[in-house]
């Protein structure tokens, strides 16, 4: 069995914890992907994980394949400046006005790590504020639990994170203006930056109030701190200008990833020119990497951005998410479940609960047991949903109306079977 072999060479048998799918007998094994479909050891599945949001055009999109193939013909790494990376950066800058200059790295984790380092270097301050339920990668600066005030700041969420590192990170309730303002006052003149997912997509899907996003901008400006929007998930998915375009708020720094790499490893941190000019070699904040602005990732990313500029991919993907959100709520209600579906652009998530979802606590209070059972049954009926209520579902330009209707029919079977298993 492949999983047994995998456990002999990988911790837990996988190379990222979310792939473990512990509620299943064994993880899914992928054999290929095309359009909206994953091909797995459980058969063909309509994919709504989409590589945790990295794929927006559909798997193995022809334009991306062609761009990558052309790059491979010319070689795949030079560790030198290329015309393609400049053209790519110019396209990013054209759509995200807050990014005046940028550095192209290799992952969202690298992007946020360097953005935090840069903010500290620019402001010459050391404390950052992040939010409960927001995920910014797997580096030490941000692996911090939520607390209830200054006395409880600095509790790590991972073994191996030094106390001296994470005591400089304060965690504040998400979508809570009063708690945020209080935290800014408590930190005072030590505050270097506030880092936030402007739409939280790594703890389910939480769409904050506009007043909250507005307060982030106002309070950081008042405090002389930088505002960092982590748009690794939302960048070029919510639209060409991301969540910052949706809310009409201009951060000082932005991080991007996922969609802008077309499924290849990439990360970007960028923002105000005066801040970015602090990055080496023009300034004292160090960043370097053999694989920075990797030609293959840049080629794939540029192909995706150019395709998105047509507008049609967004129209198809967003309509699919809207139809799924309405359809799932309708099916769940008819079968006899209390379900809330949150949706924006081509992202959606469903929760077994009554009442809205506005905070991470609302997500925690939803019935995770039912979600995991539904996830397993959906696979049985040919649909791969996000593997936890703490993740987000994504649609793509390959999720046509026919695919959506097939999905809803399959989910009706899954909900009905779930009802027969759990009863009233």
From Swiss-Prot:
List the cofactors.
pyridoxal 5'-phosphate
Q: Can you state which reaction this protein catalyses?
A: (S)-4-amino-5-oxopentanoate = 5-aminolevulinate
Quick one: a GO cellular component term? cytoplasm
SUPFAM superfamilies according to UniProt: PLP-dependent transferases
Q: EC number(s) per UniProt?
A: 5.4.3.8
Q: Where in the cell is it found?
A: Cytoplasm
Which GO BP terms apply?
protoporphyrinogen IX biosynthetic process
Q: Which UniProt keywords apply?
A: Cytoplasm, Isomerase, Porphyrin biosynthesis, Pyridoxal phosphate
GO molecular function annotation: glutamate-1-semialdehyde 2,1-aminomutase activity; pyridoxal phosphate binding; transaminase activity
State where it is primarily located.
cytoplasm
Protein origin, superkingdom: Archaea
**Residue(s) carrying N6-(pyridoxal phosphate)lysine:** 258
For this chain, the family text in UniProt reads: Belongs to the class-III pyridoxal-phosphate-dependent aminotransferase family. HemL subfamily.
Xref: HAMAP family: HemL_aminotrans_3 (MF_00375)
NCBIfam families with a match to the protein in the record: hemL, PRK00062.1
- Protein known as: Glutamate-1-semialdehyde 2,1-aminomutase
Organism ancestry:
Archaea, Thermoproteota, Thermoprotei, Thermoproteales, Thermoproteaceae
Q: Which gene encodes it?
A: hemL
């Amino acid at each position: 069995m492949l999983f047994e072999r995998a456990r002999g060479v990988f911790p837990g048998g996988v190379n990222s914890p979310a792939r473990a799918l512990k509620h299943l007998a064994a993880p899914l094994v992928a054999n290929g992907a095309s359009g909206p479909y994953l091909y797995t050891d459980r058969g063909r599945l309509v994919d709504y994980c989409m590589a945790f949001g990295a794929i927006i055009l559909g798997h193995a999109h022809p334009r991306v394949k062609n761009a990558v193939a052309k790059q491979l013909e010319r070689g795949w790494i030079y560790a030198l400046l290329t015309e393609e990376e400049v053209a790519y950066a110019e396209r990013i800058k054209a759509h995200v006005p807050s990014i005046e200059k940028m550095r192209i790295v290799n992952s969202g984790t690298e992007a946020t790590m360097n953005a935090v380092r840069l903010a500290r270097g620019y402001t010459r301050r050391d404390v950052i504020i992040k939010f409960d339920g927001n995920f910014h990668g797997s580096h030490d600066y941000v692996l911090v639990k939520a607390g209830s005030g200054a006395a409880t700041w600095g509790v790590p969420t991972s073994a191996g994170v030094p106390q001296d590192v994470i005591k400089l990170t304060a965690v504040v309730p998400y979508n809570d203006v009063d708690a945020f303002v209080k935290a800014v006052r408590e930190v005072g003149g030590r505050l270097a930056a506030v880092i936030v997912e402007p739409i939280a997509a790594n703890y389910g899907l939480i769409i904050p109030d506009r007043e909250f996003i507005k307060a982030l901008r106002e309070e950081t400006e008042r405090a002389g701190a930088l505002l960092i929007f982590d748009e690794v998930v939302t960048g070029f998915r919510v639209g060409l200008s991301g969540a910052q375009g949706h809310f009409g708020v201009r951060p000082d720094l932005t991080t991007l990833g996922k969609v802008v790499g077309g499924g290849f490893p990439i990360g970007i941190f960028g923002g105000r020119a005066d801040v970015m000019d602090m990055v080496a070699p023009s300034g004292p904040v160090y960043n370097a990497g053999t694989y920075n602005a990797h030609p293959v990732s840049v080629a794939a990313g540029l192909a995706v951005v150019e395709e998105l500029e047509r507008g049609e991919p967004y129209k198809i993907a967003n309509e699919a998410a809207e139809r799924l959100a309405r359809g799932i709520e309708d099916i769940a209600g008819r079968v006899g479940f209390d379900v809330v579906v949150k949706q924006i652009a081509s992202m959606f998530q469903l929760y077994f609960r009554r009442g809205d979802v506005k905070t991470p606590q609302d997500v925690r209070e939803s019935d995770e047991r039912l979600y995991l059972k539904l996830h397993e049954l959906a696979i049985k009926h040919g649909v791969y949903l996000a593997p936890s209520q703490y993740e987000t579902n994504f649609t793509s330009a390959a999720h046509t109306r026919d695919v959506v209707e097939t999905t809803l029919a399959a989910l009706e079977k899954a909900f009905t079977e779930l009802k027969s298993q759990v009863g009233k």
